[in-house]
């Protein structure tokens, strides 16, 4: 159990996909203008990553490997992600129209989010078991959500601040992201896996 807890903490704080691996920057910068949108995007991304991780592991080990069709892994995975996102879009449209409108174009773009594409593939290439694959997907997506929500809170404060003209817009956003990244670097020596 200790292994899974360390695995969980490591993926959330130390090996964060946004701040360390620089994956998922498009939705991170685009959907983090307010806390509601960031939280909705985080929940949607977590759902898609978790379901995709589980389904890809099952498809890989029960269909692709036994039939020696490993070369179809990426195509199968794109299909799994597309179905997960489409299912999520239908559910959100019916249950939460406000969140559906807030997410706007970013909801279908989850399909091409490099974080969503990378996490299950990293899990497969690191030869995780089924349970490790679930933990990897959940912890990596929670790390994505944590950074996204923290950044959206800071970004809401930035809008209210008096920023010098040369730093308004993208410059202050990128400076803020770099400072958050430096903060998370403080966790680097915390866990050795």
Curated annotation (Swiss-Prot):
InterPro entries in UniProt: Ion_transpt_RnfA/RsxA (IPR011293), NqrDE/RnfAE (IPR003667), NqrDE/RnfAE_oxidrdctase (IPR050133)
Q: Name one GO biological process term.
A: electron transport chain
Instruction: Report the EC code(s) recorded for this entry.
Output: 7.-.-.-
Q: How does it sit in the membrane?
A: Multi-pass membrane protein
Residue ranges annotated as transmembrane are: 5-25, 47-67, 72-92, 102-122, 134-154, 167-187
The record's GO CC annotations read: plasma membrane
- Its EC top class is translocase
Entry keyword annotation includes Membrane: yes
Location in the cell = Cell inner membrane
Family designation? Belongs to the NqrDE/RnfAE family.
Q: Share what the entry says about its subunit structure, partners included.
A: The complex is composed of six subunits: RnfA, RnfB, RnfC, RnfD, RnfE and RnfG.
Protein's job: Part of a membrane-bound complex that couples electron transfer with translocation of ions across the membrane.
Cross-referenced NCBIfam families, in alphabetical order?
PRK05151.1, rnfA
- Protein name as it appears in the record: Ion-translocating oxidoreductase complex subunit A
Q: Which organism is it from?
A: Buchnera aphidicola subsp. Acyrthosiphon pisum (strain APS)
């Amino acid at each position: 159990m200790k292994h899974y807890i360390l695995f969980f903490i490591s993926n959330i704080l130390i090996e964060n996909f946004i701040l360390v691996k620089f994956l998922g920057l498009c939705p991170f910068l685009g959907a983090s203008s307010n806390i509601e949108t960031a939280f909705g995007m985080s929940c949607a991304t977590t759902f898609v990553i978790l379901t995709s991780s589980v389904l890809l592991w099952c498809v890989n080990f029960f269909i692709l490997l036994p039939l020696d069709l490993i070369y179809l892994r990426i195509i199968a995975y794109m299909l799994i992600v597309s179905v997960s996102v489409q299912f999520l879009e239908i559910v959100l449209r019916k249950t939460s129209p406000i969140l559906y409108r807030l997410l706007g174009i970013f909801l279908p773009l989850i399909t091409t989010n490099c974080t969503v594409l990378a996490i299950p593939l990293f899990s497969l290439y690191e030869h995780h078991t089924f349970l490790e694959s679930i933990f990897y997907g959940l912890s990596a997506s929670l790390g994505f959500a944590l950074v996204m929500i923290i950044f959206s809170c800071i970004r809401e404060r930035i809008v209210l601040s008096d920023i010098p003209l040369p730093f308004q817009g993208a410059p202050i956003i990128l400076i803020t992201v770099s400072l958050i990244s430096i903060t998370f670097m403080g966790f680097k020596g915390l866990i050795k896996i």
